[in-house]
């Protein structure tokens, strides 16, 4: 029997597998596909996800296979330069196709001991007070203490949960998308696309790597369902209707369509079954937030689930996964809905778009929207206190090295600039680092394994209270 079954070997599931294995949790990942998908659902990662990869020592691998791009233009495609200053060492978006992201995360998960089994579909889920069982399409059954559905927007796990609710907003527009070859010369193509995008923001034809082009074009009508596959002829017809040319598209690698509806699961946990990533929330791909949202779900859930399995989680810790992450997803759904409205060709939304564009001339407005899209403005509600409380702490330089290099183990961390504090009683769960930084005013900060600030201060009694809140009873009390 495993500790955790993860259903879905995409970025969310693979990130979660790596996080759990860092804490010694026995993990099996199952995925319905025989081979890793080459379907490029996402093209890069934003600032907070870049920081997460750095916290786990994976960033160099991502940088080796990606390309840095400026952060401007990520809110509804409004072309404005990035803010002059962001509270991060990584003020860029890293362009890297999802298959490459999946490959790096799968290699990491395997290296730390995760068992990844492909070509196995979950067909039934049963759970009792102690365990959960997943019946697979090959007739076998896996048993574990917990199961996490990371199997995408059409999640089987979500559907198999009893009385699961996944309400949807109304779809008002559909978009066709795919990767294929084109014959139109590059200069001519760029000129045509630039002209069309003056009025059609849901339109694009551009390089996707490996000689292919990604084509995005409004669909002729909203589909009643997603059962009918998109064809190359569908895309050609819409290109001709909107651009007056089909760009000579041919040899599609993959084709799909998406709508602008949003959906958010009514709960992220049903006893021993959790949802993460697109299984819990879906939205239009505005601002490139979807993959990042799922990776950050996994980063939040991983250490908490490991704490429960390893026997030191305080009461209610697992419940904070939903209370922290669901509001974040709701905010992403809101901002993608807003962006979807702003790319409409109707006169009203276009007037609002022009107004937003004017407002983005103000540095504070531009920074606010950029921090929202890149997820570095997230602040979990830990109660009243310093503005840093509940936020992630960016990588800061220390006298000896830097902060994120000290977080690769996935443990909690007390950064103590005065050297007067102690984590005695919690040293099996949190590291105590005595060091100083010119970039941090607080005398000491307690960081959760996901890098969010759980406490700021210099009083040992207050620190002990927060250590108990996030890391359970001290070893002295458990003895």
From Swiss-Prot:
Matching SUPFAM superfamilies: FAD/NAD(P)-binding domain
EC number: 1.14.13.211
InterPro entries associated with the record: FAD-bd, FAD/NAD-bd_sf, RIFMO-like
UniProt keyword list: FAD, Flavoprotein, Monooxygenase, Nucleotide-binding, Oxidoreductase
Residues binding FAD, per UniProt: 12, 31-32, 41, 98, 122, 156, 278, 291-292
GO molecular function: FAD binding; oxidoreductase activity, acting on paired donors, with incorporation or reduction of molecular oxygen, NAD(P)H as one donor, and incorporation of one atom of oxygen
Record keyword Transmembrane helix present: no
Similarity comment: family membership: Belongs to the rifampicin monooxygenase family.
Protein name: Rifampicin monooxygenase
Required cofactor names: FAD
Function as written in the Swiss-Prot or TrEMBL entry: Monooxygenase that can modify rifampicin, thereby inactivating its antibiotic activity.
UniProt catalytic activity: rifampicin + NADPH + O2 = rifampicin para-naphthoquinone carboxamide + NADP(+) + H2O + H(+); rifampicin + NADH + O2 = rifampicin para-naphthoquinone carboxamide + NAD(+) + H2O + H(+)
């Amino acid at each position: 029997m495993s500790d955790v079954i993860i259903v879905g070997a995409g970025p969310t599931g693979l990130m979660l597998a790596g996080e759990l294995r860092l804490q010694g949790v026995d993990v099996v990942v199952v995925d319905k596909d025989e081979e890793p998908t080459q379907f490029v659902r996402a093209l890069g990662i934003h600032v907070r996800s870049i920081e997460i990869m750095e916290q786990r020592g994976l960033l160099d691998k991502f940088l080796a296979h990606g390309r840095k791009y400026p952060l401007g233009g990520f809110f509804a495609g409004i072309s404005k330069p990035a803010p002059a200053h962001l509270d991060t060492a990584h003020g860029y978006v890293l362009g890297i196709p999802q298959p490459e992201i999946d490959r790096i995360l799968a290699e990491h998960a395997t290296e730390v001991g995760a068992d990844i089994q492909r070509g196995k579909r979950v067909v039934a889920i049963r759970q009792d007070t102690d365990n959960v069982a997943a019946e697979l399409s090959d007739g076998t059954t896996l048993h574990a203490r917990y199961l996490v559905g990371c199997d995408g927007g059409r999640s089987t796990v979500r559907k198999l949960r009893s009385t699961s609710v996944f309400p949807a907003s109304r779809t008002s527009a559909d978009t066709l998308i795919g990767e294929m070859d084109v014959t139109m010369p590059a200069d001519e193509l760029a000129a045509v696309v630039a002209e069309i995008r003056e009025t059609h923001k849901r339109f694009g034809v551009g390089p996707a790597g490996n000689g292919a082009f990604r084509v995005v074009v409004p669909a002729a009508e909203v589909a009643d369902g997603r059962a009918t596959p998109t064809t190359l002829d569908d895309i050609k017809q819409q290109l001709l209707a909107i651009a007056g040319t089909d760009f000579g598209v041919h040899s599609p690698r993959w084709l799909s369509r998406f709508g602008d509806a949003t959906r958010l699961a009514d709960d992220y946990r049903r006893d021993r079954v959790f949802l993460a990533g697109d299984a819990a929330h879906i939205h239009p791909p505005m601002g490139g937030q979807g993959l990042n949202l799922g990776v950050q779900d996994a980063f939040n859930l991983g250490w908490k689930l490991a704490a429960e399995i390893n026997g030191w989680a305080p009461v209610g810790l697992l419940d904070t996964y939903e209370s922290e992450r669901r509001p974040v997803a709701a905010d992403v759904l809101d901002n993608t809905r807003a962006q979807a409205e702003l790319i409409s060709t109707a006169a009203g939304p276009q007037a609002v778009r022009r107004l937003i564009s004017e407002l983005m001339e103000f540095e504070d407005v531009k920074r606010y929207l950029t921090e929202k899209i890149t997820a570095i403005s997230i602040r979990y509600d830990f109660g009243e206190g310093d503005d840093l409380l509940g936020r992630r702490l960016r990588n800061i330089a220390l006298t000896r090295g830097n902060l994120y290099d000290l977080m690769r183990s996935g443990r909690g961390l007390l950064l103590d600039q005065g050297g007067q504090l102690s984590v005695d009683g919690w040293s099996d769960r949190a590291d105590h680092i005595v060091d100083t930084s010119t970039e941090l005013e607080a005398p000491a900060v307690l960081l959760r394994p996901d890098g969010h600030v759980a406490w700021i201060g210099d009083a040992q009694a207050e620190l002990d209270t927060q250590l108990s809140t996030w890391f359970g009873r001290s070893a002295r009390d458990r003895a």
